[in-house]
A protein has these predicted regions:
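An exposed tryptophan-centered "aromatic clamp" motif
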Residues: 146-173
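Extracellular/periplasmic catalytic domains that process cell-envelope and extracellular macromolecules
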Residues: 24-36, 84-86, 101-104, 134-135, ...
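Active-site microenvironments of metalloenzymes and redox enzymes
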Residues: 40-152
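Bacterial Sec-dependent N-terminal signal peptides
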Residues: 1-26
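Disulfide-stabilized, aromatic/cysteine-rich ligand-recognition loop
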Residues: 21-27, 36, 47, 51, ...
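Short hydrophobic-aromatic micro-motifs
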Residues: 38-43, 166-168
Length: 199
């Protein structure tokens, strides 16, 4: 009888762990239910200036290869620039005003960056999340046009169709107010958000 009870407890614990692992959203994301498809885990908001600065801090502290290992510690006092994530401050000044006001713009979307820099951000974020949270391995990446279409179809409340910001897609187009615009034809500020793909 004791043996059956112990086996029952073990099974309940294992099931609780499995359910908990599946119910946990990857850090920074919201789960979106898509009809007849697996759930999509998407950033609730576009990547902010403070998110970007944190990734830049890590990249300034050590090489990208070492990020997400015990060899890398984030020390943000480094003044040397790393071109992989450095932003064009002129774009910030045009959009947000003087750089001295960065405390006021921390939560606003990051702008003035290239698609290569967006991809670097996604890789760094993936490494850090996988290092800090071992429950599930995730890969962060830009959303595709299909992802945005599914979010629109699901009427996802965090997708702002009136935003003045365009969002870069993995396809190289800009999602703007419910439409996809070729990058060369879009003249507004461009930002991005990530989706988390569970491995």
């Amino acid at each position: 009888m004791k043996r059956i009870f112990i086996h029952g407890v073990i099974i309940v614990v294992i099931l609780a762990i499995i359910v908990d692992t599946k119910a946990t959203n990857p850090p920074g994301t919201k789960r979106v239910k898509i009809k007849n498809k697996p759930a999509l885990y998407v950033d609730q908001h576009t990547i902010s200036n403070i998110d970007w600065k944190e990734a830049l801090c890590w990249l300034r502290s050590c090489s990208e290869e070492k990020i997400g290992t015990t060899e890398c510690v984030c020390i943000c006092q480094h003044k040397e620039k790393n071109s992989a994530l450095e932003i064009d401050s002129i774009v910030w000044k045009q959009r947000y005003g003087a750089i001295e006001k960065t405390k006021e713009i921390k939560s606003l979307p990051i702008i003035g960056i290239s698609s290569a820099q967006m991809a670097t951000y996604c890789r760094i974020r993936s490494k850090l999340v996988n290092f800090k949270f071992s429950k599930q391995k995730v890969n962060y990446e830009l959303l595709t046009e299909e992802d945005y279409q599914e979010l629109l179809a699901a009427r996802w409340k965090y997708l702002d169709n009136k935003s003045e910001f365009g969002e870069m897609t993995a396809n190289g187009t800009i999602f703007f107010q419910g439409n996809f615009i070729p990058m060369q034809n879009f003249h507004g500020p461009i930002t991005f958000r990530c989706k988390a793909v569970i491995k």
